[in-house]
Amino acid sequence: MAIDLRPFIPFGRGALSQATDPFRAAVEFTLMPMLITNPHLPDNPIVFANPAFLKLTGYEADEVMGRNCRFLQGHGTDPAHVRAIKSAIAAEKPIDIDIINYKKSGEAFWNRLHISPVHNANGRLQHFVSSQLDVTLELSRLVELEKERKTLSIETARSKDQLDYIVEVANIGFWTREFYSGKMTCSAECRRIYGFTPDEPVHFDTILDLVVLEDRMTVVQKAHQAVTGEPYSIEYRIVTRLGETRWLETRAKALTGENPLVLGIVQDVTERKKAEANKALVSREIAHRFKNSMAMVQSIVNQTLRNTYDPEQANRLFSERLRALSQAHDMLLKENWAGATIQQICATALAPFNSTFANRIHMSGPHLLVSDRVTVALSLAFYELATNAVKYGALSNEKGVINITWAIMEDKGEKKFHMRWAESRGPEVMQPARRGFGQRLLHSVLAEELKAKCDVEFAASGLLIDVLAPITPEVFPGMGHNVPEQRIA
């Protein structure tokens, strides 16, 4: 259904009377879904919706006209996004925002929404104009070029201003290029994206000078490809005259003939490229952590089977140790894998024992954040040591206690981390004939992750473990060298 724009856009006399009107052509050319609302009517209703909007949402014109745009919202729409839009409209300010909207079919989609107020010559608000872009599959989809046209008339200043208005509202720059001469005509938004002044003459070489050297040849090849009449799309980097590197995406197509004219659009996609790079980084980090987790699981399996010959007991031990590993991962997930404090690690790993042995497990020390790998190693070590204490140590009788302390101390002029596990008032302990899983965790995994020295003493008063490690940013994230010294008595 064609919708008349004349009641809402200030054209001159007879501006829409011709089928080849460049403004109408530009609307069809970009296929940009657009709405116009009237804030002077109750509830700021829609008074214009172009065919692209109807196609995007699946609604008919009579289903949207006269309604507030909120009908596109649904249960998945973030209330904070809705509040931001309301605030911008109330303040008569433009806003760019990504929001979840819903089509008539009920299908949700990410809508890159741009809303801009339109004022008259006296500065009075007349309408709100909005453009939409479905960015569900990609963060920044550009408008496709329309079917080939013989000419795109920009003969009058009025027509050119109207075309610039549309592409600027959509944050998309529009340009034309004479294929053989390289002379270009650019919209105001296009000039802003490239950093050109309003009156500066623009040539293809002017743009090419901004393109980074690594991307320049590809841009030239794509530009020459346009003469075939086939549309092309390219992403490339430029360095602005202010020295800022930006990612741009251009889509173009040539109107072939005796004097080919290339029509194109350009959009700044720097933020999208940053998001893609961050996504790739996160994917690599997830893969790395998965490998580390699998290595830890394999180690638990090997150590459990090596020291346990009873299948039922091995299965029980493996399940308990795997549960401890899972609790460590849950703790890291809550902290976005930024590590955890030693206090958090102790509390989580020893929670199953505190309920049974109330007031017999004590912990104290400063707030110290350790890396994710150390978090896992400490969690398993604490759990295994507590399990052994229940079987053979301080928690195997009615009065034994465990004291876990940690501090920063000076060792030979160097700040170091000192942690102690001290059992007392339990039965006399003796050094086992061979190392169990707990000792292997201390001497292999924990010592390696902390770059630490681990001393284990089977004293008559109870098990005593001292861990001494250097202060490094890899192990203690964010910790500087000016750490107050705190000794363990």
UniProtKB/Swiss-Prot annotation:
This is Blue-light-activated histidine kinase. Its EC number is 2.7.13.3. The lineage of its organism: Bacteria, Pseudomonadati, Pseudomonadota, Alphaproteobacteria, Hyphomicrobiales. Photosensitive kinase that is involved in increased bacterial virulence upon exposure to light. Once ejected from an infected animal host, sunlight acts as an environmental signal that increases the virulence of the bacterium, preparing it for infection of the next host. This photoreceptor protein is directly related to the bacterium's survival and replication within host macrophages. It comes from Brucella abortus (strain S19). Residues 285-367 are annotated as: HWE histidine kinase domain. The keyword Nucleotide-binding applies. It catalyses: ATP + protein L-histidine = ADP + protein N-phospho-L-histidine. Residues 19-93 form the PAS domain.
